[in-house]
Structure formats: structure tokens, C-alpha cells
């Protein structure tokens, strides 16, 4: 039996790609398209079992509270999740008990693999920095993907007992060295013509390693979202990161 899916943010660029992907999938049924100003009640009325949320940081928490309270599983690509917000969502899901929530900083499988490869490489190099590039309409900087990547690198370095990265900088213009995420510098570029791109640069004596990921179109997120939709009901509570569904 097909999984009944509702898409929130259905008129956005990513939302339109998700709608097309769900519609084309033989084992999924699109039952609701929700956008700004629409009532969430349509999700209940249409019998949606899973929702996909690509809305805005301002609306996503209200959306999740509604869906979790009604036992609708959630696959979320919206950005802006702080540790405090994640803790709130985790509490909602635990209290409900029968609902799965997947929040992922990036649903492009190439991006998920980039984050995994970066964690693996981190302990072998003295230095590591992250550069992310996005279209100029993106609301947050640095991206959730870049933050998640840097956090993974920082954790791997701590687990390996590595010292602070070498950096003799004493004077610089404000922001010149990027944002600091657990001791890993993250740089954000906003530029016309870009979609979503990330470079992770590692450096050691006499060598460097660059891991690069490019999403040229919003359709790059669709395969990962569909993995989430098909599996979220088997992962009750809150899961952060698509990698947990991909066994990597």
C-alpha cells in the first residue's frame, strides 16, 4: 500500500521538486500540498502519514508541533535548528511515542557522503576548514550542512586527542577567518548562479586533501528525501542526519 505524503512548502523551488518526486514514485501517494496561508488541517483530512517540510525557520516549529501531535511522521529539510530547538522536537516526539522525525541538514546523498568522508579524514590532518557556497536568497549562514560537517570534524579530532589547529593569525578584518565551529573555521559564500556547494579542505605536512560536493539543481535532494519518507516510520523519536538511514 502506498505511503500517503503531504508536502509543506509545496510551492517553493525545493518543494516543487519534492512534489514531482513523490508523484513519480510508485510506492508513494501525494495527498496534500501545503504552502503559506494554508491550514495544516488538510494533512489530517487527507490522511497524510508522512509530511515533508521545506518551509522556513519561522514556521517549521509550529508545523512540527501540529504534525507530531497528530501522529504524522516528519521528514524535515528546513534549516535553522539550534540545539534548543532540537531538544524541544525530541521532547515532543518522545511524549507522543509513536512518531518518527528526521531532520537533516542536507538530503543530497553526495552531501551526506561528504560529511561522512570528512569525519573519516579529520584525524589524519593538522588543519581543516570548510567553505560553503549558496545562492544569495539563502536565509542562514553558514549553512546547516557546513555546521554539521565542521561539528563532525571537530568531534573526530577530539576523539583522536588532536591539539588545536595551528593558526598564527594575530590581526585580521572582522570575519576574515570565518566562523568558528568547535575549532574548525567555516566560510560562507553567497553568489548569484550558485545552488548548494561545499568544499572541505584538509592540510598536513607537504600535502592537502579537498573533498567537494556540488548540487546543481534542487532535484539533487529528492532521492534522499524519498529515503526518509520510506523509512521514517521505522525510526521513532528524533533522528538528526540522513546518514543514520543509509548505514554509513
Swiss-Prot record:
Residues the record marks as active site: 134, 138
Residue ranges that the Swiss-Prot or TrEMBL entry lists as coiled coil: none
Location of the protein in the cell: Cytoplasm
CDD domains (UniProt xref): DHDPR_N
NCBIfam families assigned to the protein according to its UniProt record, in alphabetical order: dapB
Role played: Catalyzes the conversion of 4-hydroxy-tetrahydrodipicolinate (HTPA) to tetrahydrodipicolinate.
Protein name: 4-hydroxy-tetrahydrodipicolinate reductase
Recorded name of the encoding gene: dapB
